[in-house]
């Protein structure tokens, strides 16, 4: 399979999935008076966030054999294989599929196996967004942009897409790591967008690429 067909398969299968948003689930941490005293506008994923009335703690986790790190909600767990096969039925599923207890809020991470440079992140995003919109006209891009995180160019796109149970909000981002393209994707029901948009961006901004040292 050539590189273009491989990328097309990943994108087509991901956007063709049937999601079941449901209510956002979370594990409530014990509120502390000191934490409650932090003004809402000053709360971040590093202080803990109150989302839909529940305190959510975040922690840094490592992925892709320790090559990539990112802050993730503590209650996110690996999606079980049965659910992953239903939601992401393609043969080449994302290496990382994390979800909340209800399966409504998800984070995915994929090595696209495409050779790129640090300057190509926006090109990869634009090409894949074109593919996605061509096969799914229901996709509604909301914004695109680029942030420099560490020394990496990280290109992102926000969009919504319809599902059988309602619309999903997606924050998808692309970057180079060890010469290959990585794609991260956060999604949640649009009805939960006001709670999750800020932490979704903070999660993206927390990413770290750990370059492996070559020992001669």
What are these regions (language model features)?
Residues 1-108, 113-119, 127, 131-140, ...:
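N-terminal targeting sequences that direct proteins away from the cytosol to non-cytosolic compartments
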Residues 172-176:
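A short, hydrophobic, proline-anchored segment that marks a local hinge/packing element in signaling
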């Amino acid at each position: 399979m050539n590189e273009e067909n491989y990328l097309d398969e990943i994108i087509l299968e991901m956007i063709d999935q049937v999601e079941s948003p449901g209510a956002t689930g979370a594990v409530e941490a014990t509120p502390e008076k000191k934490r409650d005293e932090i003004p809402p506008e000053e709360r971040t994923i590093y202080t803990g966030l109150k989302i839909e009335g529940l305190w959510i703690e975040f922690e840094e986790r490592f992925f892709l054999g320790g090559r990539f790190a990112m802050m993730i909600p503590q209650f996110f767990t690996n999606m079980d294989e049965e659910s992953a096969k239903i939601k992401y039925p393609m043969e080449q599923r994302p290496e990382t599929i994390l979800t909340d207890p209800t399966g409504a809020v998800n984070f995915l991470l994929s090595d696209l196996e495409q050779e790129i440079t640090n300057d190509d992140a926006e090109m990869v995003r634009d090409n894949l967004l074109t593919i996605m919109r061509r096969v799914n006209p229901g996709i509604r891009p909301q914004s695109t942009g680029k942030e420099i995180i560490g020394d990496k160019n990280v290109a992102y796109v926000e969009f919504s897409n319809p599902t059988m149970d309602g619309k999903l909000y997606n924050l998808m981002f692309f970057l180079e790591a060890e010469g290959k393209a990585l794609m991260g994707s956060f999604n949640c029901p649009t009805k939960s967008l006001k709670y999750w948009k800020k932490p979704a961006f903070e999660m993206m901004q927390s990413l770290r690429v750990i370059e492996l040292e070559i020992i001669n």
